[in-house]
Amino acid sequence: MLSDIEITHQTKLEHISKVAAKLGLNEDELELYGKFKAKISPRLEPSNSKLILVTATNPTPYGEGKTTMSIGLADALNSLNKKVCLALREPSLGPVFGIKGGAAGGGYSQLAPMEDLNLHFTGDFHAITSANNLISAMIDNSLYQENPLKIEKILWKRCMDMNDRALRFITVGQGGRTDGVPREDGFNITAASEIMAVLCLATSLSDLKERVANIMVAYDSDKKPIYVRDLGCEDAVCILLKDAIKPNLFQTLEHTPTLVHGGPFANIAHGCNSVIATKTALNLADYVITEAGFGSELGAEKFLDIKCRVAEIKPSAVVLVSTIRSLKYNGEANKDEITKPDMNALKKGIENLGGHIENLKGKFGQNVVVALNKFGFDTDEEINFVKEYCQKLGIEVAVCENFLKGGKGALELAELVLKACDKPSKINFTYEMSDDTKTKIEKVAKEIYGAGEVVFEEAALKKLEMIKELNLSHLPVCIAKTQYSFSDDAKLLGRAKGFTFSVKDLDIRTGAGFIVAVCGKIMLMPGLPKVPAAVNMKIDAEGKIDGLS
């Protein structure tokens, strides 16, 4: 089979103005970035369009194909003459050159041109990086200018959209008095910046400015918080973001319109594309497909409990993506023989799928359809077992082959999703906003993850008191934990239950408007692997790229 980039190069793409016309947009409404991408103005009016959330079972090192499935479903609906639009995240540049690769889908279900998307795209990440680092420069300048704010402990870090472990812990101001005040600092990857989360939850430019102003960046000598508004640069930060706040219009290989906008991490942030892009898509299309990062206990929970509240939206249907391979992995199959038939491992691992169905259907009250991403090594016996298991739970299953066949490989899924969208929809939230922070965390850990007990370590207990003092108990919670398990232990596979869930610390994100519960080591600046993907990339004399995936 051809590589992803070879498939892209063999596909004749439409001019972005032709793609825009499918959404009722004319060329005057586009800010063109070449032939195949454009920015559009936000449209935020209430809409009766159908929103479809794509989520997954717990991810494995192999990948479950969530973005590929989202694209395949959109192409299938497009082929059925439905007015459809995708609303997806922008990929981070760092992982493209590391081990993960890009985030444009795969096979014949891709966004294109994939090299445009995976590299600089329309410059949103660069604008976010500059905005983040302007705040850092303002902090260090305040220190240099005799520290009028009495800054004592700095929380804010610089950022860069690249995997570079050497920048995690650094010192700055080493050149003497004229070159700044010496201090310890560090870099996060841009996707981990609070500016990214703020941009993706903002509902307008004025809301963005208010959120930026409210970002807590330091504590003073009296242990009181210092905010961006105290630095006086919230307008300057938003000037850098005035174009980045506009959604980007793109297309799939089958020319389905796609809004690609924002890309916050799915652990320390909510892991969804921007509220503005999602609401704009809902104003332009009858069916909108979006996704949430990692498995449903992380990404979908944050989508439903955080994003849906902020945006005042709700899904009409939820697609739960899984693979036979991932279910066998969760059943502790031999990793060296994971592609071979193993009904014992599948029967054990399918409880992971059951746990996600229980949450989405039973807890959140969603209309769920399972999308089984089929591989060539899957057997009929294995596929039929998954179907029968889901049918007993009242869930329909579509076997999907869109990686190989494009939209026509997801037609069964499209039909099931259309049927699900015709049902009444609602959201049963995990917690009430009036609950205090501790109660909110306990409800997510016990009701969604399956924890038997929640333990707060000393640092977290101190932050709980601070949250009360700052009157921030009304904020939603965003739990940062491993994506590989329902629990906070990556090795606890399947459907873990009754475990002790440990909260190590709390990160107060006043700009984004949520409290991050830190439940394990969080990687905010990835490193490159032993053999980075960068070494396999080539570009010829005509500028044609190869080796990008």
Swiss-Prot record:
Family annotation (PROSITE patterns): FTHFS_1
Disulphide-bridged cysteine pairs: none
Class of this enzyme: ligase
Chain positions recorded as ATP binding sites: 60-67
Protein name from the UniProt record: Formate--tetrahydrofolate ligase
Stated family: Belongs to the formate--tetrahydrofolate ligase family.
Annotated organism of origin: Campylobacter concisus (strain 13826)
Lineage: Bacteria, Pseudomonadati, Campylobacterota, Epsilonproteobacteria, Campylobacterales
Catalytic reactions on record: (6S)-5,6,7,8-tetrahydrofolate + formate + ATP = (6R)-10-formyltetrahydrofolate + ADP + phosphate
Molecular function (Gene Ontology), one example: ATP binding
